[in-house]
Amino acid sequence: MTDRRGLLAGALAGSVALASRPASATPAVRFDRAAYDRYIALMNAGDLAFVDHYAADVRFVMGLRGRAAVRAFYVRQRPYVRERLAVDFFCSDAQGAAAEVVSEIRCIRDCDDPALFGRPLKAGDVQRIRGCLLYVLDPAGLIAAIKGPPPEILQPWRSLG
């Protein structure tokens, strides 16, 4: 029969052994909420450094492939619109993340090119959409793919001013 002191010593030794084990069973999440908030802040600021979160060959929801193509897409539209993203939901693990995001896209300068936004826009036009996005991470923790269903249009393009 083991005495109480022996049980406590055994339990303490076991917990020390568990505490010293490497944390390989639960890998760290590299694209956690804080990292996602930094990514969204860059997008909201119009700072193209947000593409630094992407793998070089990222696959983007709109059929774009590669970090350079995503950057070029945003460079082309930035003179005409400002986009503001609000995160309604976010979760992540070591392989990826999921988010529900509401986006307000506001036209700041007339755009006659329907290829950019599906129609010509006038300064003051605004659209609001909700997207459910899935982010797949590569082994380095960079975004390798962004996918999801077509966004829900909460407010079609209309002039607010």
What is the predicted role of each segment?
Residues T2, G6-G14, L18-G161:
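C-terminal and inter-domain tail/linker signature
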